[in-house]
Structure formats: C-alpha cells, structure tokens
A protein has these predicted regions:
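A cross-family "folded-core" feature that marks the main globular domain of proteins
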Residues: 1-478
C-alpha cells in the first residue's frame, strides 16, 4: 500500500507530483506529465492546488515553473511528515481509520453525519479501504476493526509514524506513564534506549493504550506464532512487569498473555532492544531464531558469510526475519520508496546483490508475501550486504563540525542521512576531537594530527556537497 492510496483522488495526484519532484527536481513539464500520466491542464491545476495547500497549512513549500521546468522548493524546517499529513487530513479513508483507533467502533449513520457524507458514500469508502487493508490481513466489519491484533497495531504504527507532528511525539514522550514504561524497559535491558528507539516505543505504546479499550481483540494468531517464547526468560521478566509496561491499566487475565506477546513481538522486530538483549533472546531458540538460522545457512551456501558472524549482522538478520514471520504488508511513503528498479541501496559496494537476494528468498517462501513488505525487506537485506562486503564488519562514522547552531546541525544531519538512504550502518554525530572518524564534514578550519578525510563546506549543504561526500566515502572504502 502507498500512502497516496488513502488520500482523496485530487490530493493523491498532487502528492504523486510532489513525490516525483522530491526525487527529480528540477524536472521538465513533459517529464512530469509522462511520469504521472496527467494532461497539461490537470498538471497545472494540481500545481496551483499544491501551492495553495502549502499556504493553508503554513508549510514552507512551493513549486516554481520557469522555462517549462518545475522546481520544488522546501524550507529547511519543513518536515516530510507535516507535508504528508496536509494531504491526508481531509481524506475520508484516513479520518475513518483515525476514528476507529480512538473510538473503537462506529455507527454508520452517525459517522456519515460527522463526515458530512451519505451512508452510501461511507459504504463505498469502507469497501475501498478494506481492499487496501487486505494486504495487512485485517478489515472493517460492522463498524469495528477485525483481525489479528498485532497486525492492526503494526499498520497503525506505520501510518502514524509517517504523519505524527513533532508536537505529538513531544506530548506523548512527556507523559509520566510513558516515562515509567521507558524506564522499566531500560531496566530490564540493562541499557538506555536511543532517542529514536524511545520515540518508536512511545508511539507503539500510544496505539496500545487506544486498543486496550477494545474488549474483542484477537490474540489467537500471535499466541500461536509466539508460543515458543512464553518460556523465554526475557519474556517472563517482561510479563512480571506488566503493570509498569501498560501504565497500570487493568488487563483481563485472559488477555494478559496476548497483550504481552504483542508488545514482545514489536520489541523483537523493530530494532528497539539493544544487541546484547536480542542475542540473549535468540539464544533460547524460538521461531524467529530458527528462521534467522535458515537465512544464515542460505547465505553461507552463497558464500556470503563465513563461520564467524558478527553480532550486528545476526541482529539485523533477526529483525528482518521477525518482520516477515509476524507481519504482512507495509505502508510505503510513496511509489519511489525502496524502488530497486531505479535506485539502489548501496553506498560503498560496487557489487550488485539483487540476483543472489532473489535466489535466497525464493528458497524461503515466507520472504515472498507479494506485498510491499517484500520490497522493504529486500532493500534492508541489500544494505546489510553492502555493510558486510565492503566495510569488514565496521560501521562508517561521520563527524559534523559546524558553526550553524543546534537547528542547523539537526537539519544538516537529517539531510545527510536522507541522502545516504538512511543506511543504518552509517552513524553521523557531532565532531569530538577525541573520537575517530571515517570522514569529517565541517565549515571550520580543522587541524588534525591523524589522517582523516575532511570535507569543507563553503556554504549551506547542497546537492553538490552531498554528491561529493558520498563519493569521498566510496573512495575511502572502495
């Protein structure tokens, strides 16, 4: 599923234009028309609507037309999730999904009145939405969400993660209940979560709090799939802290196992737990560990792995296996996300592993769902191969030394990460003279005793700088 599938027809068309220009700006009118199949009149209408919507939502975003070329201009403080939300907010399908999350159920007549549409129109939207939700194996029936509970929450996690404003996250993170949950999890892991892990955890917890109001959650599938983990020592430790992990909310005894298994499923598949905790869990066996072992054996047969496998590699493989084992479907940001036909996930590798990926995954049918999750998993596996083959088991570390203030530093970090395809094996941090780096990006004169490549910025970080930085990394590692 693409995010645009949830939008109204006009907004979906506008979002398609935006998505193309985010990848290819500037583009000629003819190129955009060919890419979108819009007539010139429709394209011009949508361009006007995009600029109007940006003004209405106070987004620093505009599309300029000059000499038959379109150029997308986006302010440094404008976030992608704010843009996406602006195009979703008036969508009937999106409003319906949000209503179900926070209200749990609806009466068709009442909801149609609230949305200012007829019951027949509401029925058509529900029917269309159910066709989309089939990818995630749940549906809307009789005014309620019906399906495996872990898959419902997984879908909402993917949706809200793409549209929640910074204020939403800050508000949730500031709640005493969320802080207690984080502290409890950190205590159980014996390690602090990163800020990104905390944000993902509180979002999942927020969704959980809404779903706890539902008395008809279906846990049969997660209980069957995760039955090998109920005796796992880490799971049992989690279970003993059920009150702290669910904000003291009352959970029926018949639902305790189901609720905890859903939380456990999230923790072991979304890169929340630290490496040593995940190794501990995998050490006790279980279905995800077994699938990870199968994948490792197939990779060894292709001579991609030796006898010794580093912890970070096993960790990534376990996350990939956990996702395909427990979940189906994926909500793609746009049609270009994880698009291997036109982009590749490699930063350093000159070798293409796409064919060997097809060979390996064809032997493990669980990796071939026929959903958007296939694309995401294949992309992440190829990123891992890039890391294994070219970096000798070592993460690439980039230091930023910039006199631009906190906001400038944060923006440049986000831009650089976005350009490097959000490769999890590249870390970008504030420059520390006492640390070692593979590359330093700076707009200050730096005197170094050790030989570290330095890229000097003359002005703001632009596309030429980004291309040069990527080239320098490749040259150093290639």
């Amino acid at each position: 599923m693409h995010l645009a599938d949830l939008m109204e027809k006009s907004e979906g068309g506008q979002f398609l234009i935006l998505s193309h220009l985010q990848q290819h700006s500037p583009s000629s009118l003819s190129e955009v028309m060919a890419e979108t199949d819009f007539s010139k009149a429709t394209l011009n209408k949508y361009l006007t609507l995009i600029n109007d919507k940006a003004k209405e939502n106070q987004l620093a975003l505009s599309i300029e037309l000059e000499d038959e070329n379109l150029r997308l201009l986006v302010g440094s403080d404008t976030k992608g999730r704010d843009i996406r939300r602006a195009f979703l907010d008036n969508s009937i399908k999106y409003q319906l999904l949000i209503y179900l999350l926070y209200q749990g159920q609806f009466q068709a007549q009442q909801l149609a009145q609230e949305l200012l549409i007829s019951e027949a129109t509401l029925g058509r939207h529900i029917s269309g939405l159910n066709k989309l939700l089939a990818e995630f194996q749940f549906s809307i029936q009789n005014g309620r969400l019906k399906g495996p509970e872990h898959k419902i929450r997984y879908f909402y996690f993917g949706l809200l993660r793409k549209v929640w404003a910074s204020a939403d996250w800050k508000q949730e993170l500031a709640k005493k209940e969320r802080q207690t949950e984080i502290e409890t999890l950190e205590e159980l892991c014996g390690a602090q979560l990163s800020q990104g892990q905390r944000l993902d955890f509180v979002l999942w917890s927020h969704i959980t709090q809404q779903r706890l109001k539902i008395n008809a959650c279906q846990f049969q599938e997660i209980e069957q799939k995760m039955k090998g983990y109920t005796d796992n020592i880490f799971y049992q430790r989690l279970f003993r802290r059920v009150n702290q992990l669910f904000s003291g909310k009352h959970i029926a005894l018949s639902h305790e196992d189901g609720e905890m298994l859903v939380l456990f499923a999230f923790l072991v598949t979304h890169r929340i737990l630290p490496l040593h905790t995940m190794e501990y869990i995998l050490g006790f066996g279980g279905e995800i560990g077994n699938l990870t072992t199968q994948l490792i054996q197939e990779m060894k047969m292709q001579k991609l792995l030796g006898d010794y496998i580093e912890g970070p590699v096993t960790y990534e493989l376990s996350q990939i296996c956990g996702q395909v084992y427990l979940f189906t479907g994926y909500l793609l940001q746009d049609k270009y996300k994880y698009q291997l036909e036109t982009h590749n996930p490699y930063v350093f590798s000159s070798h293409d592993y796409r064919e060997v990926a097809d060979t390996i995954f064809s032997k493990l049918p669980i990796f071939c769902q026929g959903t958007a999750l296939d694309k995401k998993i294949k992309w992440e596996w190829l990123q891992l191969m890039d890391y294994i083959a070219e970096n000798s088991g070592r993460q690439i570390k980039i230091g930023l030394d910039l006199t631009v203030g906190y906001l400038g530093y944060t923006r440049m970090t986000e831009v650089l990460k976005r350009y490097l395809e959000y490769n999890r094996f590249i870390t970008i941090e504030a420059f520390d003279p006492a640390s070692d780096y593979d590359l330093i990006v700076t707009n200050n004169p730096i005197s170094l005793t050790q030989r570290i490549p330095v890229y000097y910025l003359k002005y703001d970080l632009d596309m030429i700088d980004l291309a040069n930085i990527r080239h320098m990394i490749y040259q150093e590692e290639g």
